[in-house]
From Swiss-Prot:
InterPro entries membership: Endo_dU
Organism: Methanocaldococcus jannaschii (strain ATCC 43067 / DSM 2661 / JAL-1 / JCM 10045 / NBRC 100440) (Methanococcus jannaschii)
HAMAP family: UPF0215
Pfam family, one: DUF99
Family: Belongs to the UPF0215 family.
Name of the protein in question: UPF0215 protein MJ1150
Length: 184
């Protein structure tokens, strides 16, 4: 069994909803201790359908709480359309485990068709997605993880959930993102 304190420090990233006409999107990172104490909320702009969300995530993680953060949670591998977070690069640059949490198993065939239809660099994006571990069912969610083992992932998710099936840091980042809808 992996021993972990209840107030394990984690950060969870999600994006705010966006419109088709938007050129930039908003990334939200919520830094928490366990499942109850919020110690920071961070924002970055990134390009819709670009390839810069990875550097924005790394930038936030390396900011104020770098030494305290034990785990990076992502609400999926794509942000702002098809801006793909490179799990390997985030793990390498931050030296932190990266855990992706999603509700449903992704339809890769549909994703790859969309990439091929709209992106000149579709092959590069598809190669990146295929390099990631396959999503794995864990209770009622799917997870992908880099830099950690299954037992660690189960334990940290358990410690960081409250009443939802996902870690609180992701739930709060999502709620904050939804709040941006009123600004449009």
């Amino acid at each position: 069994m992996v021993l972990m304190k209840d107030e394990v420090e984690v950060i969870g990233f999600d994006d705010a909803p966006f419109n088709k006409a938007d050129k930039v999107c908003i990334l939200i990172g919520t830094y928490m201790r366990g499942n109850r104490i919020i110690d920071g909320i961070y924002f970055r702009k990134f390009k819709k359908d670009g390839m810069d969300v990875t550097e924005k995530i790394i930038d936030i993680v390396k900011e104020k709480h770098y030494k305290k953060i034990k785990v990076i949670f992502l609400a999926g591998i794509t942000f702002g359309g098809f801006n793909i977070a490179d799990l390997w690069e985030i793990n390498k640059e931050t030296e932190k485990p990266v855990i992706v949490v999603i509700d449903k198993y992704p339809n890769k065939e549909k994703i790859f068709l969309a990439l091929k239809k709209y992106f000149d660099d579709a092959d590069e994006r598809i190669k990146l997605i295929n390099s990631f571990p396959e999503p794995e069912k864990m209770e009622n969610i799917y997870v992908q993880y880099v830099g950690a083992d299954k037992e660690f992932v189960k334990n940290v998710i358990k410690k960081t959930k409250l009443k939802s099936k996902i870690p609180e840091c992701l739930r709060i980042s999502h709620l904050i993102g939804r709040g941006f809808l009123g600004l449009r």
